[in-house]
Amino acid sequence: MTATPARRTSLASPATKPVAGGLALAFLATLAGGALLALALEAGGGGFDAAANFDTYLWRVARFTIWQAVASSLLSVLFAIPIARALYAEARFPGRGLILRLFALPLALPALVAVLGVTSIYGRNGLIAHISDMLGHPMQPDIYGIAGILIAHIFFNMPLAVRLLLAAYESIPDDHWKLAAQLGMGSRARFRLIEWPVIRRSLPGMIGLVFMLCVTSFTTVLTLGGGPRATTLEVAIYQSLHFDFDPARAVALTFTQLALTLLILLILRLTGRPSEEGFTQTATPRRYGSPRKTERLFNIIVIALGFLYVALPIAGVVVSGLTADLVRLLSERIVWHAIATSLALGFSAALLAVFLSLALVAAREATRNARIANIFDTGASLILVMPPIVIGAGWFILLRHFTDPFVMAPLMVVTVNAAMAMPFAVRLLRPAWDTAASRHNKLCSQLGIKGFNRLRLIDWPSIRRPCGMAFAFAMALSLGDLGTIALFGSDALVTLPYLLLQRMGSYRTFDAAGLALILGVLCLALMMIADRAAASRKEAFLQ
């Protein structure tokens, strides 16, 4: 077989790969730099009074932001340790695989949907309140405030910590378990001598990761905060622009949020990151010996409690959604308009995220300079330094000097959501692209296959499934986003999360429950597509 050099250039052409990667980095730099420039100009203007804006209110909000993140992180990890230990010990526990899959759902659900699930269980009219009435001890739990924030954050982050801890358990050598069985070690001795050293090494990075997720939690605090006493920096930024329209206050809050985020990332870099294997299905434990009856009973109770804590809010979303008048809801034009808008914006953001991520991955593989390759490799992750609400606030302040910010809302929602999905898309695409390049580069060079022909005939079959995974994941993230649309949303641009927030704000709880079910089904369907693509890709690789 012979091939003539293609005249058309593309992402697969060696000459254009670094250029395409540079353009992708320029996109991220413009998005983040534009927001920082706007904030700097606003702060440097005559109307910014540092003493007036860095006041007791700001420091009170900052203290609460740190306090709720510390409490959420410690509680999430504290509850995760016995659950992970029990799941690892009970290798043949019925439904163990389903429980691990269930523990992957909280991060896949949009935060607004999960919050409604939490309120359906722990709210004043929730399941716990109904059970207490039936038992003759009526109670009205208050879900709004610090209690609700902690419950929701544990729901999101405890399953993540469990999966990360299971990955740490997998690193324990077989010889340690064999020796423990031969010596007849009890549960406490095994934990102290074998398990705890491995857990202790994983704790700093794991707590730091959960802390970062809680500090940048916007939707959960916005809906469950319950008032000024339970306000974080990101929610305060939103309130200062959306309700008070106080750009100077927003600048002070944004700089504080940015400084806190940078400090957390620095600490994470010093302490190390948790193993990425925790995000995948864990293998069967290689443990020798069986637990004693009392230990097994304790393990079963712990697993059941962990399962109920995660499963009940998800079931609450389904039950509440099905009790809503879905027929009437789906007959409303605004609902279909919101669905269409969400799908259009999500599709555009996912397409942009995959294209830019491919450009970075291809540029990294084609670059021979190690430093430049490292820039391409880490460039997408650097955008995580700036939370979406910070980028949105910066551009909102910048655009108001030139045009109506709400006119630019679709563009801002697409670009910010695409940028936030890029770190995950790069992680999914990089292994497949590097593998395909190592297999085919030499042969394609000898045959003169390059440009669009190489991309179509050689590279695309290898990266098709990872691209589908990245696209579905990015679209699901965009569908459930509320951070950017909360700033730029209006009657002219209504997405499903924005409409859901409006219905919650007007106390139309049944409508909100129905919309939450629709949004949750859409996002979970996309996540299932990505998961199936990953599974089929793994099977094809093993064959």
Swiss-Prot record:
One of its GO terms (biological process) is thiamine transport. Keywords: Cell inner membrane, Cell membrane, Membrane, Repeat, Transmembrane, Transmembrane helix, Transport. It is found in: Cell inner membrane. One of its GO terms (molecular function) is transmembrane transporter activity. Residues 62-266, 339-530 form the ABC transmembrane type-1 domain. It holds the Pfam family BPD_transp_1. Gene3D superfamilies: MetI-like (1.10.3720.10). The chain crosses the membrane at residues 19-39, 64-84, 102-122, 142-162, 205-225, 250-270, 300-320, 343-363, 379-399, 406-426, 468-488, 510-530. Its main location: membrane. InterPro entries: MetI-like (IPR000515), MetI-like_sf (IPR035906), ThiP_ABC_transpt (IPR005947). GO terms for cellular component: plasma membrane. It is a multi-pass membrane protein. PROSITE patterns: ABC_TM1 (PS50928). Belongs to the binding-protein-dependent transport system permease family. CysTW subfamily. The complex is composed of two ATP-binding proteins (ThiQ), two transmembrane proteins (ThiP) and a solute-binding protein (ThiB). Part of the ABC transporter complex ThiBPQ involved in thiamine import. Probably responsible for the translocation of the substrate across the membrane. This is Thiamine transport system permease protein ThiP.
